Swiss-Prot record:
Pfam families assigned: EFG_C (PF00679), EFG_III (PF14492), EFG_IV (PF03764), GTP_EFTU (PF00009), GTP_EFTU_D2 (PF03144)
Protein name: Elongation factor G
Ranges for domain tr-type G: 8-282
PROSITE patterns: G_TR_1 (PS00301), G_TR_2 (PS51722)
Subcellular location per the Swiss-Prot or TrEMBL entry: Cytoplasm
InterPro entries noted in UniProt: EFG_II, EFG_III, EFG_III/V, EFG_IV, EFG_V, EFG_V-like, EFTu-like_2, G_TR_CS
CDD domains the UniProt entry points to: EF-G (cd01886), EFG_III (cd16262), EFG_mtEFG1_IV (cd01434), EFG_mtEFG_C (cd03713), EFG_mtEFG_II (cd04088)
Gene3D superfamilies hit by this protein: 3.30.230.10, 3.30.70.240, Elongation Factor G (Translational Gtpase), domain 3, P-loop containing nucleotide triphosphate hydrolases, Translation factors
Keyword Nucleotide-binding applies: yes
Length: 690
C-alpha cells in the first residue's frame, strides 16, 4: 500500500486543556465534522467516542490518550487525546513528546486555570507549536477578550486573535473572520449550515481594531509584511496565512479562535486553523538520538527513505487483541510482519499486525510511513518510552523520564482465590502506566500499589474490578518516603564461600556519594585492568539496585545516589554473577549505614483558589501543615495562593478546605520534588514503622 497522504499534509496534534474546558466535546465534534463518527457523543451522557474506558465515561474525565485518525480538506490529522486532571500529567507529557502541534482549549468563562498552566509549561518544554481555542462562548460569564489577556499575562505567550465572537452567552451565534474580514453566522443546531456574510455594523469598529492588532503581530515576525504594513500597502490573505504559520511554528505567536463545541459552533474554522497553522512533520527539525553505545549523536530526517525509527509512547492491554503498543514513526517505513530492533532493551521484536485507531474502531493497515501514528500487535518486550528502529541502523531516541510514585496503599483481594488473578492484573496495569508501581512489602507481605495521587489509585482499583473481575479491599493511603545519603563514603563488599564443592567469590570496592535531587541512581564503572571481568559488572549494578529497594532507615527505596565501582577482585573458578550481585548488595548496604542516611518526603506544589475573606485562615492552615507559601495573586475576583506542602500533611485536605471556605475554595496539587524530612518528624515516622 503506497503512502495515502504526502508528508506535508499530515498533522499530529494533541488537544490539551484544564479538566472542564470542554476538550473531549471538542474532539468529538472534530470527529463528527471530519466524518468519522455519525452520531454526536455527549460527555455528560457518557458516550463520547474518545473516552472509551468505562470509568472515564462515568467520571466524565479523559484518562488514557487514545490516538485517532481523521481527514479534513485533503489533510490527515492524527489526534492524541490528553487527560486534563493533575494525577495524569504523565499521560500529557507522554503524548506531548510525540506531537508536532497542539490545540490548547480554554473555557471562555474560567480562562487560564492551574492545570492549563501546567500543561502549557510541559508543551513549552517540548517546544510544541500551538493554537488556542476559546470554547464555551455560550456559557454565562463568557469573555473572549479576558481569556486573551490571561493567556498573555499568566502563560507569557503572544496570543493573536484571528477571529472575534459575534454575541456571547446565549446570544453567541457566530464569528468574525479577521483574515477575510467577513462574518460566519450559524443557522442550525448541528452547525453544518453557515452563512458567510458582511460583518454586522455594530461590530465593525471592534473588528477593525483586532484586524490591526493581527497585522501588527504578524509584521513583528515577518519582515516583508513589516515593510508592506509600514508603507500602508494591501496585505493578501495568502501572506497573512503564511506569516501566521511561520510565527506559530517558530513559537513566536499563538493564533486564537473561538466557538462553542457543545453548541456546534466554530469547530470547522478550528479545523481550518489546525491545517493552516500547525506544523507537518516536515516543518520540524530532524529527531535526535544516540548510537547504542552512547558514543555519538545521530539524527533521522522525516523522510520515508531514511532508516526506520519510532518511539513507543503508550502500551495498552486490549481485551480483543492482547497488548497494543502505540508508536510514532519519525523516519522510514515499516511493513506489518517485519522485524524491528527495540534498541532500548536490545531485543528484536516482530511487528504482527499494524492498526490505525479510531476512538473505538480499528482499521488494519499493511504499512506505516514517516509521520504516522499507529498501534502494533505482537510486541513482547516493548514498554512505554522505548525506541523501535531498523536493526541495521540502530538509534536510541531520547526516552521520557517519568516521576516516581508519591502515594501508596496496601491492597488485597476479597477472596484468597483471587490473589494470583490480582497479581497478573496489576502487572498488566503497571506495564501500561510507568508512573504506577506494584510490589510486595517485605515485612508485612502485603501487596502495595503506588501512583501519582488518590484519584490515580482509585482508577486502578476500579479497573481491577471492571476489566479483570477482581474485587479488592484497599488500605489507608501511605506517603512514598525515600532514603538517601548525605556524605561520600568508600566501602568494601565481600561474598566468599569456599568450603567443599563449587565456591562463591565476589569482591568489590564502591565509592558512594549523594547525587543532585531528582537524578535517581547513577552507576559508573571505573574498573581498569580487568580486576573484575567485564561480564560481572552488570551483576554488581543489579545487586546495588536490589539493595536500593530497601534502605537502612525504614526499608524505604533509596534515591539520588551516585555509585562508582572502583576496585575489587575475582576468582578464576568460583566467581559468578550471583557472587558479584551479592557483593554489590552487601557493599551498598554497608555504605548506606556509613553515609549519614536521611529520610526524604514528597513535596507537592499546591495552588489554592479562595475568596478574599478566607485567605488568612487558609494560609494559616497551610503553614500549620508545614507548607511554605511561595506567592499570591488575584485571579478573576479570587485570591490564588501558591505553596509547597509535604504530601504527608495533605491527606483529607479537600474536606478541610471545603469546611474552612464554606465550599467556595478549590485546590490542585501535583508532585514537585523530594526533600529531607525534619529530624523530629523523621523520628516519629521511623518509630511508627518499627
Amino acid at each position: 500500500m503506497p503512502r495515502d497522504f504526502s508528508l506535508d499534509k499530515v498533522r499530529n496534534i494533541g488537544i490539551m486543556a484544564h479538566i472542564d474546558a470542554g476538550k473531549t466535546t471538542t474532539t468529538e465534534r472534530i470527529l463528527f465534522y471530519t466524518g468519522k463518527t455519525h452520531k454526536l457523543g455527549e460527555v455528560h451522557e457518557g458516550t463520547a467516542t474518545m473516552d472509551w474506558m468505562v470509568q472515564e465515561q462515568e467520571r466524565g474525565i479523559t484518562i488514557t490518550s487514545a490516538a485517532t485518525t481523521c481527514y479534513w480538506k485533503g489533510h490527515k490529522i492524527n489526534i492524541i487525546d490528553t487527560p486534563g486532571h493533575v494525577d495524569f500529567t504523565v499521560e500529557v507529557e507522554r503524548s506531548l513528546r510525540i506531537l508536532d502541534g497542539a490545540v490548547a482549549v480554554f473555557s471562555a468563562k474560567e480562562g487560564v486555570e492551574p492545570q492549563s498552566e501546567t500543561v502549557w509549561r510541559q508543551a513549552d518544554k517540548y517546544h510544541v507549536p500551538r493554537i488556542a481555542y476559546v470554547n464555551k462562548m455560550d456559557v454565562i460569564g463568557a469573555d473572549f477578550f479576558n481569556v486573551i489577556d490571561m493567556i498573555r499575562e499568566r502563560l507569557g505567550a503572544n496570543p493573536v486573535a484571528i477571529q472575534i465572537p459575534i454575541g456571547k452567552e446565549d446570544t453567541f451565534r457566530g464569528i468574525v473572520d479577521l483574515i477575510k474580514m467577513e462574518a460566519i453566522i450559524y443557522k442550525d443546531d448541528l452547525g453544518t449550515v453557515m452563512d458567510e456574510t458582511e460583518i454586522p455594523e455594530d461590530l465593525k469598529p471592534l473588528a477593525e481594531e483586532y484586524r490591526e492588532k493581527l497585522l501588527e503581530a504578524i509584521a513583528e515576525v515577518d519582515e516583508t509584511i513589516m515593510e508592506k504594513y509600514l508603507e500602508g500597502e494591501e496585505i493578501t490573505e495568502e501572506e497573512i496565512h503564511a506569516a501566521l504559520r511561520k510565527g506559530t511554528i517558530n513559537g513566536e505567536l499563538v493564533p486564537v479562535v473561538c466557538g462553542s463545541s457543545y453548541k456546534n459552533k466554530g469547530v470547522q474554522p478550528l479545523l481550518d486553523a489546525i491545517v493552516n497553522y500547525l506544523p507537518s512533520p516536515l516543518d520540524l527539525p530532524p529527531v535526535k538520538g544516540m548510537s547504542i553505545d552512547g558514543g555519538e549523536e545521530l539524527e533521522r530526517k522525516p523522510d520515508d527513505n531514511e532508516p526506520f525509527s519510532a518511539l513507543a509512547f503508550k502500551i495498552m492491554a486490549d481485551p480483543y487483541v492482547g497488548k497494543l503498543a502505540f508508536f510514532r514513526v519519525y523516519s522510514g517505513t515499516l511493513k506489518a510482519g517485519s522485524y524491528v530492533l527495540n534498541s532500548t532493551k536490545g531485543k528484536k521484536e516482530r511487528i504482527g499486525r499494524i492498526l490505525r485507531m479510531h476512538a473505538n474502531h480499528r482499521e488494519e493497515i499493511d504499512a506505516v510511513y514517516t509521520g504516522d501514528i499507529a498501534a502494533a500487535v505482537g510486541l513482547k518486550d516493548t514498554t512505554t518510552g522505548d525506541t523501535l528502529c531498523d536493526e541495521n541502523h540502530p538509534i536510541l531516541l531520547e526516552s521520557m523520564d517519568f516521576p516516581e510514585p508519591v502515594i501508596s496503599v496496601a491492597i488485597e483481594p476479597k477472596t484468597k482465590a483471587a490473589q494470583e488473578k490480582m497479581s497478573i492484573a496489576l502487572s498488566k496495569l503497571a506495564e501500561e502506566d510507568p508512573t504506577f508501581k506494584t510490589y510486595t512489602d517485605q515485612e508485612t507481605g502485603q501487596t502495595i500499589i503506588a501512583g501519582m495521587g488518590e484519584l490515580h489509585l482509585e482508577i486502578i482499583v476500579d479497573r481491577l474490578r471492571r476489566e479483570f473481575n477482581v474485587e479488592c479491599n484497599v488500605g489507608k493511603p501511605q506517603v512514598a518516603y525515600k532514603e538517601t545519603i548525605t556524605k561520600p563514603v568508600r566501602v568494601e563488599g565481600k561474598f566468599i564461600r569456599q568450603s567443599g564443592g563449587r565456591g562463591q567469590y565476589g569482591h568489590v570496592w564502591l565509592e558512594m556519594e549523594p547525587a543532585p535531587r531528582g537524578e535517581g541512581y547513577i552507576f559508573e564503572n571505573r574498573i581498569v585492568g580487568g580486576v573484575i571481568p567485564k561480564e560481572f559488572i552488570p551483576a554488581v549494578d543489579a545487586g546495588i539496585q536490589e539493595a536500593m529497594q530497601n534502605g537502612v532507615l525504614g526499608g524505604y527505596p533509596v534515591i539520588d545516589v551516585k555509585v562508582a565501582l572502583v576496585d575489587g577482585s575475582y576468582h578464576e573458578v568460583d566467581s559468578s554473577d550471583m557472587a558479584f550481585k551479592i557483593a554489590g548488595s552487601i557493599a551498598f548496604r554497608e555504605g548506606m549505614k556509613k553515609a549519614d542516611p536521611v529520610l526524604l518526603e514528597p513535596i507537592m506544589k499546591v495552588e489554592v483558589v479562595v475568596p478574599e475573606e478566607y485567605m488568612g485562615d487558609v494560609i494559616g492552615d497551610l503553614n500549620a501543615r508545614r507548607g511554605k507559601v511561595e506567592g499570591m495573586e488575584t485571579r478573576s475576583g479570587a485570591r490564588v495562593i501558591r505553596a509547597f506542602v509535604p504530601l504527608a500533611e495533605m491527606f483529607g485536605y479537600a474536606t478541610d478546605l471545603r469546611s474552612k471556605t464554606q465550599g467556595r475554595g478549590t485546590y490542585t496539587m501535583q508532585f514537585h520534588h523530594y526533600e529531607e524530612v525534619p529530624k523530629n518528624i523523621a523520628e516519629q515516622i521511623l518509630s511508627a514503622k518499627k
